[in-house]
Amino acid sequence: MTIAFQLAIFALIATSSILLISVPVVFASPDGWSSNKNVVFSGTSLWIGLVFLVGILNSLIS
């Protein structure tokens, strides 16, 4: 169970880092938002899902 928790934490950190870099780049580019809107929403949905997964796994480990 701790391996799954550690992998979920790693995925959350990696997703956060990717979104931290990609979202400002998408907003700064002139045509970026209209063409990359689905990617940003997918990444945000993944991030929210990982936050809930980490919370659930944390409650099971503690």
From Swiss-Prot:
It holds the Pfam family Ycf9. GO terms for cellular component: chloroplast thylakoid membrane; photosystem II reaction center. The keyword NAD does not apply. It is a multi-pass membrane protein. Its main location: plastid. It is found in: Plastid, Chloroplast thylakoid membrane. GO terms for biological process: photosynthesis; photosystem II stabilization. Keywords: Chloroplast, Membrane, Photosynthesis, Photosystem II, Plastid, Reaction center, Thylakoid, Transmembrane, Transmembrane helix. The chain crosses the membrane at residues 8-28, 41-61. PSII is composed of 1 copy each of membrane proteins PsbA, PsbB, PsbC, PsbD, PsbE, PsbF, PsbH, PsbI, PsbJ, PsbK, PsbL, PsbM, PsbT, PsbY, PsbZ, Psb30/Ycf12, at least 3 peripheral proteins of the oxygen-evolving complex and a large number of cofactors. It forms dimeric complexes. Belongs to the PsbZ family. May control the interaction of photosystem II (PSII) cores with the light-harvesting antenna, regulates electron flow through the 2 photosystem reaction centers. PSII is a light-driven water plastoquinone oxidoreductase, using light energy to abstract electrons from H(2)O, generating a proton gradient subsequently used for ATP formation. This is Photosystem II reaction center protein Z. The gene is psbZ.
